[in-house]
Amino acid sequence: MDDDIQAVVIDNGSGMCKAGFAGDDAPRAVFPSIVGMPKHLGIMVGMNQKDAYIGDEAQAKRGVLTLRYPIEHGIVTNWDDMEKIWSHTFYNELRVAPEEHPVLLTEAPLNPKANRERMTQIMFETFNVPAMYVNIQAVLSLYASGRTTGCVLDSGDGVSHTVPIYEGYALPHAIVRLDLAGRDLTDYMMKILTERGYSFTTTAEREIVRDIKEKLTYVAMDFDEEMEKSTRSSALDKTYELPDGNVIVIGNERFRTPEVLFNPSMIGRECSGVHECAFQTIMKCDVDIRRDLYSNVVLSGGSTMFPGIGERMTKEVIKLAPTAMKVKIITPPERKYSVWIGGSILASLATFQHMWISKTEYDESGPSIVHRKCF
């Protein structure tokens, strides 16, 4: 690899795609992982209509489009759409020729083998990249926090995972996947705001609710106490101005929304809360490394951005952990993008340069090379 050619780092999430260049401290492009297809062909007279819109443009024109999310629960389910997103990333967002840059991609923990192969194949055959590599998202988040051992709780828009990592390697047998993340919280908030008499139903309105969620919600230290406080006074109420100028009042929805992460039964799910997932993950690991994991629980992803989540998580994990165990929850301020940042760090390390899968290796071995080189 030439030293002067920057690698491209792409973190494809269920909700947002983060892309940029290795060595940078933040992604240059962050856009929704959405592909929009026109509902009715030729409806906009005089508009030179495209056959597909990606990301923010799809979002802006969502009224006349059918929106699709090619990544569901962290796993790619529609490869044609995924290819469109990658193409948009290279040519429109980063404005680079993919055949000139090595590409580091991220994948969800427990990503099916066939998916990694498909990813590899598209990169080499469709985009002709000179080299590529695939890494697990949670591992990159841990690197970004300056650690090689820890338990990562990564919660994004489509899926959450707790992943134990020891000396840089994820321990797959102990990974816990939780199909509960930002999108479910937005849905729940839409529901409870509707119960309050505000109507949020369309995909456009869902984006408004997502914005309310990101700006005004927080995690209560003690849910019942907070509920009581909110019934007694309106001190917790906040106002939010809708795009049409109307102002709505948000009350206990502010902390009821993220509470779902700790108590999924609120939305009728029988799964464990995020604190129990972290505990289960640690308990599935060798007894000798548990102490290291308990003292290095790193939060990452957009759905860990709620104020108060670190304190609440500490309180809940201490309740589950053995007495006298030191529990430390780390909430890096840049955790919304820590997967991408970890990728940027990794791809710019001198020691990483021999790890890339080169085009030559791919041509010799085919897509299955990814299992031998990326683990």
From Swiss-Prot:
Catalysed conversion reaction: ATP + H2O = ADP + phosphate + H(+)
A Pfam family it matches: Actin
Matches recorded under InterPro entries: Actin, Actin/actin-like_CS, Actin_CS, ATPase_NBD
GO MF annotation terms: ATP binding; hydrolase activity
Documented EC number(s): 3.6.4.-
Keyword Cell inner membrane: no
SMART domains per UniProt: ACTIN
Keywords: ATP-binding, Cytoplasm, Cytoskeleton, Hydrolase, Nucleotide-binding
Location of this chain's protein in the cell: Cytoplasm, Cytoskeleton
GO CC, one annotated term: cytoplasm
PROSITE patterns in the cross-refs: ACTINS_1, ACTINS_2, ACTINS_ACT_LIKE
Summary of the tissues where the protein is detected: ACTA and ACTB are actively transcribed in mycelium, sporangia and germinating cysts but only at a low level in the case of ACTB.
UniProt-listed Gene3D superfamilies: 3.30.420.40, Actin, Chain A, domain 4
Function comment: Actins are highly conserved proteins that are involved in various types of cell motility and are ubiquitously expressed in all eukaryotic cells.
PANTHER family recorded: ACTIN
Family: Belongs to the actin family.
Protein name listed in UniProt: Actin-2
Protein's organism: Phytophthora infestans
Name of the gene this protein is made from: ACTB
